[in-house]
Amino acid sequence: MAVTKRAGRRAQGGTQPAKGAQGVKKATFESGKKREVGVSDLTLLSKVSEEAINENLKKRFENGTIYTYIGHVLISVNPFRDLGIYTDAVLESYKGKNRLEVPPHVFSIAESMYYNMKSYSENQCVIISGESGAGKTEASKRIMQYIASASGGSSSNIQKIKDMVLATNPLLEAFGCAKTLRNDNSSRHGKYLEIQFNNQAEPVGANITNYLLEKGRVVGQIRNERNFHIFYQFAKAASENYRSTFGIQPPEAYTYTSASGCTSVNGINDEAEFKETLAAMNLIGLTQAEQDNLFKLLAAILWIGNMSFVEDKDGNAAIADVSVPNFVAYLLEVDAESVVKAVTQRIMETSRGGRRGSVYEVALNIAQATSVRDALAKGIYNNLFDWIVERVNQSLRAPQDAARTIGILDIYGFEIFESNSFEQICINYVNEKLQQIFIQLTLKTEQDEYVREQIAWTPINYFNNKIVCDLIEEKRPPGIFAALNDACATAHADPNAADENFIQRMSMVGQNPHFEQRQRKFVIKHYAGDVTYDVKGITDKNKDQLLKDILILLQKSGNPFLVSLFPDPVNTDNRRRPPTASDKIKKSANDLVTTLSAAQPSYIRTIKPNQNRSPTEYDEKAVLHQVKYLGLQENVRIRRAGFAYRQTFEKFVERFMLLSGKTSYAGDYIWQGSAYDATLCILRDAGIPQTEYQMGTTKVFIKTPETLFALEHMRDMWWHNMAARIQRAWRRYLAYKTECAIKIQRFWRLKRGLDGLKEIQFRDSGHKLLGGRKERRTYSLIGYRRFQGDYLGCNNGSGFGDFLMKQIGVTDKVFFSCRGQLQQSRLGRSSVRVPRTFILTKNNFYVVAQQIHQKQLVVTNEYTIPVRNITHMSMSNLRDDWFCLNQASSPYGDQLMWCVFKTELAVQLRVVKPGVDIRIGPQIDYFKKQGKKASVKFQKTTTLQTKFDMYKSGSVQVPPGAPPNSVSKETPRGRAKGSRGGAPSRPAARGNAAHTPTPGAAALGYQQHQPGSAQPASPRARKAPPPAPNSRGNGHAESAQPQAYNNLQPHYQSLVNPRSGQGQQQQQHHQAYQQPTAAQPAATSYSPAPAKAAPPPPPPAPPAAPAAPAEPTYKALYDYVANGLNQLSISAGEQVLISVKEDQGWWLAKRMDGSEEGWTPAAYLEEVQGGAAAPPPAAPTAGGASAGASLAEALKQKQQSNQTLGAGIADAIKARTGRPADDDDDDW
């Protein structure tokens, strides 16, 4: 994982500030963002009224925004145009988002259903309601589009199921939709599509339930409407084979497609849609033989409609053109004479006392013959449509039981025409049932649940349409359907008599306030408005049965496909009344209610803005009427006063137990109390205010959706954090293994005398490169110094160095990488040194900046210096660490940089560019910007209080260093194993123990204390405890860590996110490393028992001199203004306390009253003489004697450490740790 650090103030000045360096983005004018019009959720209206709702919908419609919420209910206004809001890009933007993160959209409803199905293992459904032409079918198609895209699974079978589900749309639209006066693609049947999913939330099947096809449309339509789409598609785009075989003509040639005077529609391309229909048939799996039979029967229906009648001499019906029934007989594969007889005659049977009587053949008049002809066409099409639905289900059937389902209801909308008959009663009855479900689940059930759960609640009045549903479907008292069935049973032979009987029976339902009788018409006051129905022909439509003569004719067909459409054998002796159309629609509606009630519903309420299908017209009066009958105002009020989410205690705990450490551990449920108490515990531990929830008797109620989304987000992040924790542990383990292997390899090379030969050669080439022209630092000359090059591990393939390379997009091999500093100019102020990372590859030298942006570490490539542009590298002749890579030309000028490994950088630069010149002199000349030359002079001084160089106003003060002709010391050799002076070896470190710092770590020693870096105060080194009495001069081997490593620790702490577990663990890790341990006795484990008793311990040393005050007082010589959050501003003459002194020129100071603390430049301070007197020394104790002995031993070891180092790499490191801080006056 990436290493992060605390965010500090923005770095001041600089020629190229890193993008996103602040937590707050720069304010910009969002010209491309679409302006919000109105409110996106009607619950946010300042005034709740039907007029205010209508006005808000109008504003959004005119702005091209068609979707609005009422809580979780979506309001959709039909735009009658393509708004471009259903593209793949828009769809992708809604994946994984809750409804508050994105604008209202049908995709958001689909995402919510799919997420709830996966998360709560509950079946989902969406109920789309509204009047005809409001956009219900389009909404259902878009939900299917989203679910097919968002659902998981990439196997061929799952993808095939998705494609087949989408293919049901064009197929069922062709056979079940038609052009009406109000809608060019009106659904003339109801469809409930259930998409079935497995346990992985992948679609594995589907099932379609069909409701009440309007088969009367096959034989007649009102003016300017059309038959079902498939007839026009087939008549216009049939293949030549079908035209010659089935006698297909243009739609104008058929009575059933041309009588209404509309065969073409603007915006509908019948030829192109016929191709889509054929493609859908092929995709679903209809064979060519099945398609041929299907189109053969469609041709038969068209030709049946062309059979016309004339009166014979007896006034009965006779066929006008005999060739038409002959061709119909050819298509139906029956005898032509049988066809003529079936449509012109009827077999009547008399009975006496329950016994069969005489059989008569009764001739039909023209009206009766036309009715029989139309019944034949309607029966064939109705059964053909049912076969298509069943065949689609057969292809979509899941191979195994589905775990969960998502249901999509697309059903005809509420209809009010000038002339309304039985079809409109059935359609409006189904819409009443859907409205009843909506009221039951969103209004009544919700308020009843509040009362049952004892939740504080103010009841809200609403209209319950159950009284209207009872008016239509009830048996006692009898409703309209019951009266219809009684009329059909009483006067079944004469349709006119049956209609009269029905008028008389309607007097029994006249008591209902929502019913009015008007002569041969009646009015039902529906929730959507008053509708007047015509009684004429209503009982005949309710019978919904084919004459037995027709059934016998069809079952004698030589076409097995046609026979299979009418599988029930004709029982001529059965006297029982078959189910009527009202019985079927009532049963279907109740089954639909049962299915929908078993799932968690979502709602889409569609609104039709005008009756002219205009994309710009908004009929306020018509929309206001829809707002009223849809009950949107009551819905808004209940939503504002209610709760967004409710769940039983058990299911809530099962879902969110991970949010509390008291209820779960490692994903297991550990709570021992009740589910009620566990729910309270989870809500408290998650930080949910008590005002955001109420506890019922069996359920918890969450008031706002924001609270629920917050709980869900915290639950998702729990899994993310657990995965990150496992990844960190694994990476720590791999890093530890690698480090152990490296230590073993290094030790083995050391024993064989091969340790760092290549690095030593590089180091020695550095001496030759300088050529005695530059003073050296002490640490540059020690025997253990190696030129490693890639100190950050950029070539390792993992770790922080690899992370840097990926962030700046560099893949080349790295020759040199190290941390350093950059001298950054500031307008009107002194320049400042800012920490940077330097990376050298074969082609470029990179200056990389790291900053905190929105609590995330942001790495940017600040400067790229091409190696080919570098003319020479400039350095001073003193022991400082400044250098400059001078370029032939650069728009940003040359950069003055500081790096402790500048000699090694020069060597590596010579490797990648052999001809580069290394210029060493008393000053560094460079170009601050293009055409502006500058120089920095270097002066040696012995009065500098800091141990590093100091830059000020173009001049650098440098302490004296080693002579220029100095070379590295020899690598120390290990002692013999039996040496008395050797330190006892320590046991190997465990996996979590601290690791020995590498030489590259010293490069971090200076930069973290500079202005602009965001590090905490540098921890003080702890005093070593006294050694054990039996230890023999081993105090130096067990002392504290070297100063360079102590300087390194604040940098690591500043890069680690303090909120993460990793940061805390890293801090503990370094503290554990700093804590010195007492030396262990060497007698029992490593040497035999002495022959004589051990000599008594030496007498305790005299008390040490009084220590200096813990926090000496200093006075400020100049004003200093802080440049970072970790710095302290001081005024000239102000006195401060110094708690930590660092070698790099920065001291940790705090106000005299302790109110503020921060880093301040040491050069600005002067110690105040005669500070507070030190407290008297404590009386010597045994512990004090041990401490004195330990100090004496440490001083003795200091004298010996320059002569002999410990055996092996471990002893060498121990020897380094034994040096007091006063000797660490130099870095590498």
Curated annotation (Swiss-Prot):
Residues with the Phosphoserine modification = S358
Judging by the UniProt lineage, the source's domain of life is Eukaryota
Protein's name in the database: Myosin-1
The record ties this protein, via SMART domains, to:
MYSc, SH3
Q: What family, per the record?
A: Belongs to the TRAFAC class myosin-kinesin ATPase superfamily. Myosin family.
Q: Where is this region: Disordered?
A: 1-27, 953-1040, 1053-1109, 1169-1228
- Which positions are annotated as binding ATP? G130, E131, S132, G133, A134, G135, K136, T137
Q: Entry's Gene3D superfamilies?
A: 1.10.10.820, 1.20.5.4820, 1.20.58.530, Kinesin motor domain, Myosin VI head, motor domain, U50 subdomain, SH3 Domains
Skewed-composition ranges (Pro residues): 1093-1106
Subcellular localization: Cytoplasm, Cytoskeleton, Actin patch
Q: Which residues form the TH1 domain?
A: 776-962
Q: Which PROSITE patterns match?
A: MYOSIN_MOTOR (PS51456), SH3 (PS50002), TH1 (PS51757)
Among InterPro entries, the record links this protein to: Fungal_myosin-I_SH3, Kinesin_motor_dom_sf, Myosin_head_motor_dom-like, Myosin_TH1, MYSc_Myo1, P-loop_NTPase, SH3-like_dom_sf, SH3_domain
- Annotated CDD domains: MYSc_Myo1, SH3_Myosin-I_fungi
> Which SUPFAM superfamilies did the record assign?
P-loop containing nucleoside triphosphate hydrolases, SH3-domain
Task: Please list the residue ranges annotated as the Myosin motor domain.
Answer: 37-716
